[in-house]
Amino acid sequence: DLHKEYRRQRQMCIRDRKDAGELLSDGDQNNTHATRYINRVASKENLEASNAFFANVVEQIHRRGMKVIIDGVFNHCGSFNKWMDREHIYSSSEDDYECGAYERYESPYHSFFKFYGNQWPDNGSYEGWWGHDTLPKLNYEESQELENYILDIGRKWVSAPYNVDGWRLDVAADLGYSKEYNHEFWNKFRKAVKEANPEAVILAENYGDSYDWLQGDEWDTIMNYDAFMEPVTWFLTGMEKHSDEMRPDSLGNPDYFFGAMHHNMARMGGQSYAISMNELSNHDHSRFLTRTNHVVGRVAELGPEAANKNVNKAVFMEAVVIQMTWPGAPTIYYGDEAGVCGFTDPDNRRTYPWGHEDKELIAFHKDVIKMHKENEVLRTGSYKQLYSAHNVIAYGRFSMDDAVIIVVNNGEDEVRVNIPVWETGLGMDADVEQIMATFEGGYTIDRQGYRLKDGKLDIGLRKTSAVVLRKLRW
C-alpha cells in the first residue's frame, strides 16, 4: 500500500530528527480547498471516525518517543465553520445541523460574532480578523457559551483518549476585544489545560513584547520571533523575514544581533526563554534558504523559481548551527532540512520533495541534531556572549563541568580571532576540541584540538563558516 509506505517513511524521517521539533504545515489550502474538504467530512459519522483516527496517531507517535502539539485558532474561525456557515455547507448537509449565524438571526451561534447590520438572511456585516471576511472574529465578551466551549476544547485534546502534549495558540494576543479580557481568558485557559494535563505546554504565537503573558499564569512560552528568528535573519542575510526588505546595515552587524537578542531574552524571562520555539522558517514567512539569496519580493510578482536561485547553503548551515546551540527549543519547519525554498505564504508551503531531497543537508541536520542531543549543556546550560566584530560572533554555553564554544564568521574573508573563552569557566590553559565546522562546500564532524593560552582561544575561520568546540573530555 503506497499510502502506508508513505506514512511509514515520513514517521521514520521525523523520528530521525525528533530532538528538534518539526513543524508540519497544513498545506496550501485556501478557502475553496477547505470548503471542498469539509463537504467530504462534515457528516457526524466521518467526524467521529476522524477523531478516533487522530487518537490512534497520537498514541503511535508517543510510542516512538515523540510528542504532539496541536494548533488552536481561538481568535477567529473560518467563514465555512458551522457557527457562521457562509458557504452553506452545513445547512445543505444531510445531518441535522443548526443554522449558522450568517444565515439567520435566530442562529444559536449569533452571539459568537459581532454584527454591524441587520441584513439577514445571509448577513455579511460581521467583524473579520484584520478585515478578512473569510476569518470571522470570535466575540467572547458577549457569549459565555463560546468561552465555556473553547475552555472545554482546551481540556478535551490534552486529555484521554487524545492525550496531546500541548497547544500552539494562533495570534494569541489578538483574542477578544480588549487587553483586559485577553489576559482574563488566557488565565482561565491555562487553568483548564493544566488541570487536565499538568505537563501540557502552552505556546503562543505573538509578535512583539510578550512580557505580560509570561508571568506564570497564562502562556508558558512563545514562537520566538523577537529573540531568535528576526535577529538571526538580519545578521546572516540582511533580510526581513518575509523577504519584503533588504537592510545592508543589519547584515553582519553584531551590535544589532546581540542587542536584539539580549533585550528580548530579558523580556521573556529564563524559564520561558529556555523552551521558546526557535525557528528559522515557518508557514507565515519566507524560507530561510530563500532569504540567503537577498531577493526582495513575493511569489505573485517574481514567480516560484526566483526563490530557488542563488541561495547560499553555507549561510543556511551557519543559521542551523546557531539554532541548535542557542538557548531554546530548536524547531525545524518541514522541508528546511531537505533544502526546500519558497517566498512567504503561500510559496513557503511547498510539498516535501520526496526522492529529491538535498542529501547533504539531510545528513547535516542529522549530525547537528545528534550534537545537540549528546551535549546536555546545549539544552540546559547557561549562555554568554564572548566576542563580536563585523560579520563575526562568538558565544558560549556552559555549566559547572562542561562548556561549548560557538564561533560564526558570516563574512566573505577568512579571519583570525582571539576569544576569551575563560569566561565560560574553562581553565587558562585548557584543551578544547572542534566537534563540528561548516563552510562553503559542506561541513565536517572531524575532531581538531586546540589549547587555550591565557584563557583565550586563537582560531582561524574560513569565510562563511561556523565552528563548534567543546571542553576536551578525557
List where the protein language model places each region.
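Single conserved hydrophobic/aromatic residue that forms the stacking wall/gate
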Residues: 1-14
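Aromatic- and acidic-residue-enriched segments that line the glycan-binding/catalytic groove
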Residues: 11, 15-26, 74-127, 212-227, ...
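The substrate-binding groove and active-site-proximal loops of carbohydrate-active enzymes
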Residues: 15-51, 132-147, 170-181, 245-252, ...
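Substrate-binding cleft of carbohydrate-active enzyme catalytic domains
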Residues: 33-88, 92, 101, 108, ...
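Conserved alpha/beta catalytic core and glycan-binding cleft of carbohydrate-active enzymes
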Residues: 80-83, 186, 190-191, 199-346, ...
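Active-site neighborhood of glycoside hydrolase catalytic domains
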Residues: 130, 134-210
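Aromatic- and carboxylate-lined catalytic core of secreted/periplasmic carbohydrate-active enzymes
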Residues: 353-386
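C-terminal beta-strand-rich structural cap/linker in extracellular carbohydrate-active enzymes
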Residues: 448-474
